[in-house]
């Protein structure tokens, strides 16, 4: 028997179709919708269904169903609401996770929906309680527990209730007191302050005083005296007796039971493996305090209901009492459930239909069949390339590691790495309101441990000398993040290495030296999404390394070949031409097309053999997960924080943001100085433990980010307010300051000076001839047998570019302006005459020499500048010109936004039958009218653009605008 949405109670029909929270209260065994303004209000005599719908980065919807049982609700109602959740899950496709939530023992995920807390009120529908607020305020005492989410419970208003370990809130008619036990943590005190604010706003209409009382303050403190006076005077608090909390109660081990016709039978096995679970059955997994129900995909809805009812009975009769009951469907098991098994296979990914078509298309095209339209080309897939969230016009310096020293590379060699070596890069670039810095280490696959250790040590010293301002990155060959490629722009990886440690290692182990030689045989695979992100990777010179979806460069002693797979696009081939200009400039080439190769080509590759056709793709970025970490004696404990915000980042702690393709380690300002240097170890341990069982590779990029210096590619995961990290004190002191100072920070953090970046700059190298690798133009001479049509394509692909890299050209066309909205060329005719002359003069000024050593810190740089002689007239004029240009650029940007044409939604959506032409396809929403925008997104444009980019993209996906 199948169960569809129309079989549900009318109140539940249509649920779970968009992101958000939906709540139903059970009245007379029927669900009744709870209005949004009442979300978070629960009554002890009632039961509720809470549905959380989340849109993933892929655009699919994920559902979590919780049924909450008040302490005074009946068992019959609990059973009825449990069955309703099974029906709702079936109607939603049978993929939801179901949670049984008991008042006082709610899961952290459930509590995270209703931050800062829930405070259930007495009464309910069955008791006839009318939910009317009492006329007189009643003094109440609450205990607060939790560092990340707060569990609030009303306790007797007597002095003996207080203790040294916990945080308490005393709510009186005119003032709210927070009492912090001397042994309570700073994080618990800070979180309790959020509850104080909630009580003030909810029960006092925001009109009452707040007082913080610390354990140990005597009557001499006025607020402490007032607090103790409410308890009849001060008296020493007794020591809290040691008790076994539910969370620490011992279990008798994990037991598995099969459920048939409502009866449970133990499953005997030496160890738990997935093979014990039959897809035609349901099971109960007893884990002591936790209880799981597993439902096979082939089970009927009646079987699932029966298993749920059996689990409810199992739950009620257990000793000691259970805390949580979670139901999962086969194929959609939670991490917690899978972790209970000794053996659980990695999730097998189902091949996409597109990949299957790719193999067929390659085979047919080799036979001369036209396969246009059968597969998507790389130009369409390039749209899926993640955004870098980093400016590509900054200053770059690169050092190669040789034992314990670092050697600065010349500008022309900065993007050419050897697989047997290690490198350090320092990159400074303009941020939104300050100069941003990144110090990274790159480890080649063949590099030796000695060089890796030296690279980490030297990079740490660089970051320390800059007062820990830069973000720090650990990058491994083959797992480079998009930010790295945008910084390098045209990146080449050669086989072998040149460091002394590498040479010594291969000599001692009799390993052949395969280090790249310009005159030898070498094969390069070309990849990337555009001129700002392209790579040439040297691979084994064998035909098995070819791929129908890629372009290649092959050179021998005196011959250069290019090879284009049949599934490559014109953009792929253009990238190959660009990389060819870097690897073998000014040399004639022999173009080879798949299926019509010459014998000489195959001879260089050692003969012809089979090779794949599927495009080598990067792992996709997943939805971010935030973890709070403690690291003692090389043992890492990580606690996930659900539905996280910036406020969850506590200054005393270290957090990890896991995005699957990259991991961020965030270090708070108040973290113990002895633990700050362990940040990289914490990140590496996190990869090793793989807490989400997502098969994290040990080579996954790790970023170390310090509080107050978060780069844009980190803050994009939050709705970020930079002023919050500009406050003094610990988490408790900061939040208390916000409460008592009407939300104003104690101290505005000074902004770092933002230098003017007109183009990508590096250490100048006059000894090197100007490379022609990035100088395509309409007038470029034909080379390597290019046709006029190809040269025209090259001209359109590149445009004339003064920095020979990836930034937009100075004079931008309307289409280019859409692609590069932040890049503007100044129109000197619009600048005041004096400023225009200064700008022209500045072009002839000698460039300031670039230091080849990393700056010690922004503050020390400013101090040095102040000590220098007064600026020359030309320098002053240049600054005035730049200031004028920047102002004009801002005005131009504002005018551009306001002057965009508007189009109907039906013409802008991705599947439109009458699509609009000549619009920026990455910003379709910008062309909606204000009325239609608010109708589709349920918010204004200003509110929308304040959201993190990934959240904007999620919303755009949900309305077919991305």
Curated annotation (Swiss-Prot):
| Secretion signal, residue range per the UniProt entry | none
List GO BP terms, alphabetically.
actin filament capping; actin filament organization
Q: Where is the composition biased (Low complexity)?
A: 845-862
Give residue spans, biased composition: Acidic residues. Answer: 889-898
Instruction: Provide an example Pfam family for this protein.
Output: VHP
Keyword Secreted in the entry? The reply is no
Is rRNA-binding a UniProt keyword of this protein? no
Keywords (alphabetical) are: Actin capping, Actin-binding, Calcium, Cytoplasm, Cytoskeleton, Phosphoprotein, Repeat
The family line of this record is:
Belongs to the villin/gelsolin family.
Protein's job: Major actin filament stabilizing factor and regulator of actin dynamics. Binds actin and actin filament bundles in a Ca(2+)-insensitive manner, but caps the barbed end of actin filaments and is able to sever them in a calcium-dependent manner. Required for the construction of actin collars in pollen tubes. Acts synergistically with VLN2 (AC O81644) to regulate polarized pollen tube growth.
The record's GO CC annotations read: cytoplasm; cytoskeleton
Gene null: resulting phenotype:
Retarded pollen tube growth, but no effect on pollen germination, root hair growth, organization or amount of filamentous actin in pollen grains or tubes. Increased sensitivity to latrunculin B (LatB) and instability of actin filaments in pollen tubes. Decreased severing frequency of actin filaments. Vln2 and vln5 double mutants have pollen tubes curled and wider at some regions along the tube. They accumulate actin filaments at the tips of pollen tubes.
Q: List Phosphoserine occurrences by residue.
A: 777, 787, 883
Annotated tissue distribution? Ubiquitous, but expressed preferentially in pollen and stamens.
Which PANTHER family does this UniProt record tie to the protein?
A: VILLIN, VILLIN-5
Record-given protein name: Villin-5
Q: Where in the numbering of this chain does the HP domain appear?
A: 897-962
Residue ranges, annotated region (Disordered): 749-785, 845-917
> At which residues are the Gelsolin-like repeats?
29-79, 150-190, 262-305, 396-453, 534-574, 636-677
